[in-house]
Amino acid sequence: MTAALGHLVVEGLGPIRRVELDLTTDITVLIGANGSGKSNLVSALELVSRVVDNTATDRLTRQAGVARQYFDGPSGSVDSILIELTQEKSSNNGLSLTYRTRIENDINDQPLYTEELTFQDNSGTPPLFRQEFGPSQHSAIQRIACDPAHELYGAVESFIPLVSSCRVFHFDDVSANAPVKGFSTVGDDIYLRSDAENIAAYLLKVRNDHPEHYQRIVSAVR
């Protein structure tokens, strides 16, 4: 079973100068004033997943470029974004795996990603292993995940499902043209899209294949 996310660090993203969170429970509730960075903190998780699956560049470009995402406040400005995820100790021989990505912009405001993997045990001593990749326009982690012969394949293989599941879903659009109110094909049911465009097809699949989970959803809505 994939180990859970245990610790999150975000630096330099939007209004966030630096935030550290211990994610030790199944549900984490974020409370803060408007503009304090709650949505940015959640978006950081999705951004990491998109770095790993090589779709972050398109996302950042559609958001007016990398530099526009940097923190800029009374305490100064930054020239990069840092996101760090630590996986709880699991199948990696009792070791915790930390993945870190630093996102910078080149002269054309295109993103460059520097990734780092670190393994640590309970002793508190220096890391048992640390390796940095990049800067590059593509994820080294994704490349390793596609290469069973790579020495880090086993560790990355257990990490990919965790980071790939970090997606943000926005269901609060109630306008006439909201994607959730549109049509979707029955076959578009492999995964739930972030804008809920295919929610009808997806719920149909859940109802047919996982009726217990479907009833839990129905009960929660009611």
Predicted regions and their residues:
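Conserved lysine of the Walker
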Residues: 38
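Walker A (P-loop) ATP-phosphate-binding motif of ABC ATPase nucleotide-binding domains
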Residues: 27
